Amino acid sequence: MLGITNISQSQAQPPNHVYELRMYHTVPGRLTALVNRFRDYTVPIFAKHDMHAIGYWVPQDTPELFVYVLEHPSRDAATKNWAAFMADPEWVKAKADSEASGKIVDHVDNYFMNPADFSKLK
């Protein structure tokens, strides 16, 4: 019974951070354009808006996919940071310029995640 109580209390506590998993499915042949846009523009603009990346990945077995994880203090902070990012004139220009030769992203899957109690990331 004590173990169940501890689990319930652990789950009831708010997490210190929320993590956002984002998976970008690119238009065929446009993965390199997306990676370049992230390297050259998106990452520095994220920093301006307190969007902290944990890492970026290109899966070995899934072509046309780009994956990254952001850390946010809360879901509310994530919403505010994304709104500021999307309205940033530097981002608007970078997106338009990078898509001058065609759309890059087909669709995005994203998930907000809380760390498990045994996770090294809290």
Regions found by a protein language model. Give the residues of each.
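Short beta-strand segments enriched in hydrophobic/aromatic residues
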Residues: 25-26, 72
